[in-house]
Amino acid sequence: MERPISVLGTAPDVVVENVEEKVGWLRRKFVPREFPYLEWTVDGVPLRKVVAWPTGDVAGEVTPIENEYAAREYQADYLRAILGEPVEREWTIMSDGRVPLLVCSTDFDLNCRALTAELLVSRALVEWRDIAWQVDYEPLDLAEQEQPVVSLTFDRRQYEAIVRPLLMALTES
């Protein structure tokens, strides 16, 4: 059976999180803060919506791409991982080798929760296999997912035409 080929893209997006801020000498309160970033799209649909819960709720996790709170070096390593290339920081990927697609919007910590996939790269295709939520401190159990586990397949040339320029912009400037 032939796998459907999806088209990877990107779109600017913003997630709003309540963060604690100092509002006086001793007083703190939670205030909404916008976290702009570049979201993956699959066939024109934001990845967060592709993996939305049955209620329609979407996760607060984001990509670190074009995210002012993510260090450029981390953004570059994240994109290397998405391309299936070696990373400089081992904490960029899960300890089981899975690649994070979406990470915590406030600190990018893989132990908060991350949407991950087994990345398979062949001559012609890239596959995000068994997309699932996981934390790095526990083994992944696909049977315990709260929503169906899906896989996505992309044409490698089209995929790299989206991802590689993002990496080059970070490493060549």
Regions found by a protein language model. Give the residues of each.
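Intrinsically disordered, low-complexity acidic regions enriched in Pro/Ser/Thr
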Residues: M1-S173
